[in-house]
């Protein structure tokens, strides 16, 4: 048994443990071809389907006659929501997740090995979505921290920009997307 174990261990190949994930794109390969670039920009859209980003139309409908709402939406609808209710922190986190994804695309797409027409389209989409997420945050919080690159942990305490500056950043992103 000892001899068989020694032979089995010595015959193992060292590169078996150095594998790449096949079920998801790593940060190094994410922007390496047109398909991955398209998926990266699609992930910015995916944030639109999450939590309070997606529920705003439903929440507005809840004000109508005969509408019903779920228990966890009641504080917002009744005007009694507090900072501790989680509604505002969820709203913040979900929008900044979209901004992070948009920034990742905006930073990496210019160097991606894809056609200029596809690159321009994807960059425009990323800039429009980043402007949209900042628009939504600025409308609620009247000034937020502004990031134009993927945020690192040591940047999490960045000071808040003025409301006017955020509007100007949104206008610039939309102007860039048009051009």
Predicted feature descriptions by range:
Residues 15-16, 52-53, 67-69, 137-146:
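Proline-centered turn/helix-capping motifs that create local helix->coil transitions or kinks
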Residues 22-26, 79-83, 148-155:
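Short linear capping/connector segments at secondary-structure termini
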Residues 12-59:
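Membrane-proximal, proline-rich intrinsically disordered regions
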Residues 33-42, 46-49, 72-141, 155-166, ...:
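Conserved, well-structured interaction surfaces
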């Amino acid at each position: 048994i000892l001899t068989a174990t020694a032979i089995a261990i010595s015959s193992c190949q060292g590169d078996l443990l150095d594998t790449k994930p096949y079920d998801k794109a790593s940060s190094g390969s994410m922007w390496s071809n047109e398909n991955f670039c398209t998926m990266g920009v699609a992930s910015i859209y995916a944030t639109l389907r999450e939590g309070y980003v997606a529920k705003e139309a439903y929440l507005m409908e809840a004000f109508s006659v005969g509408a019903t709402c779920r228990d966890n939406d009641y504080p917002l609808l009744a005007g009694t929501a507090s900072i501790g209710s989680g509604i505002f922190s969820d709203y913040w986190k979900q929008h900044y997740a979209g901004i992070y994804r948009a920034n990742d695309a905006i930073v990496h797409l210019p160097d991606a090995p894809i056609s200029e027409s596809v690159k321009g389209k994807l960059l425009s989409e990323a800039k429009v979505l980043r402007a949209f997420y900042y628009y939504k945050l600025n409308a609620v919080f009247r000034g937020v921290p502004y990031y134009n690159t993927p945020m690192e942990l040591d940047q999490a305490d960045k000071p808040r920009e003025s409301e006017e500056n955020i509007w100007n950043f949104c206008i610039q992103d939309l102007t860039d997307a048009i051009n």
